[in-house]
Amino acid sequence: MGRFIFISFGLLVVFLSLSGTEADCLPDWFHYEGHCYRVFDEPKTWADAEKFCSEQANGGHLVSVHSRKEAGLVGVLAYQTLESPIVWMGLSKVWNQCDWGWTNGAKLKYEARAEESYCIHITSKKKEWKSLPCRNYGHFVCKSPA
């Protein structure tokens, strides 16, 4: 367990040193590859979290993940900040269709979900994607363009 925390912390330090805090991100937001990220420790339903993210930054949404590297970053940020296993992402069923879609309109290119349901959260420790009813409360990560 101690080694896992040490490695996770090391990854976070590497991400921080490579990305830094850009002037284009709001205070307390983390910059990475042209986007700003922030973990919020305020449990909300998925819809309330998405609304909150859109109010925090121009173009803000619940986090969308498009690569294994970005998934690792989000998992490390969430794990270092939160004790909760539930961290909402911006992936959900779109208007009762069979298609999954990101709240920012981006196409789904990368996924690691464990099962289907309504809204997806990332487990902060294992960094796996799982589904829960959207009415459940969870912490969340917002993402916006830098």
Curated annotation (Swiss-Prot):
<dbReference type="InterPro" id="IPR016186">
    <property type="entry name" value="C-type_lectin-like/link_sf"/>
</dbReference>
<dbReference type="InterPro" id="IPR001304">
    <property type="entry name" value="C-type_lectin-like"/>
</dbReference>
<keyword id="KW-1199">Hemostasis impairing toxin</keyword>
<dbReference type="GO" id="GO:0090729">
    <property type="term" value="F:toxin activity"/>
</dbReference>
<dbReference type="GO" id="GO:0005576">
    <property type="term" value="C:extracellular region"/>
</dbReference>
<feature type="signal peptide">
    <location>
        <begin position="1"/>
        <end position="23"/>
    </location>
</feature>
<feature type="disulfide bond">
    <location>
        <begin position="25"/>
        <end position="36"/>
    </location>
</feature>
<comment type="function">
    <text>Interferes with one step of hemostasis (modulation of platelet aggregation, or coagulation cascade, for example).</text>
</comment>
<dbReference type="Pfam" id="PF00059">
    <property type="entry name" value="Lectin_C"/>
</dbReference>
<feature type="disulfide bond">
    <location>
        <begin position="119"/>
        <end position="134"/>
    </location>
</feature>
<keyword id="KW-0732">Signal</keyword>
<dbReference type="InterPro" id="IPR018378">
    <property type="entry name" value="C-type_lectin_CS"/>
</dbReference>
<comment type="similarity">
    <text>Belongs to the snaclec family.</text>
</comment>
<feature type="domain" description="C-type lectin">
    <location>
        <begin position="32"/>
        <end position="143"/>
    </location>
</feature>
<dbReference type="InterPro" id="IPR050111">
    <property type="entry name" value="C-type_lectin/snaclec_domain"/>
</dbReference>
<keyword id="KW-0964">Secreted</keyword>
<protein>
    <recommendedName>
        <fullName>Snaclec 1</fullName>
    </recommendedName>
</protein>
<keyword id="KW-1015">Disulfide bond</keyword>
<dbReference type="InterPro" id="IPR016187">
    <property type="entry name" value="CTDL_fold"/>
</dbReference>
<keyword id="KW-0800">Toxin</keyword>
<feature type="disulfide bond">
    <location>
        <begin position="53"/>
        <end position="142"/>
    </location>
</feature>
<comment type="subunit">
    <text>Heterodimer; disulfide-linked.</text>
</comment>
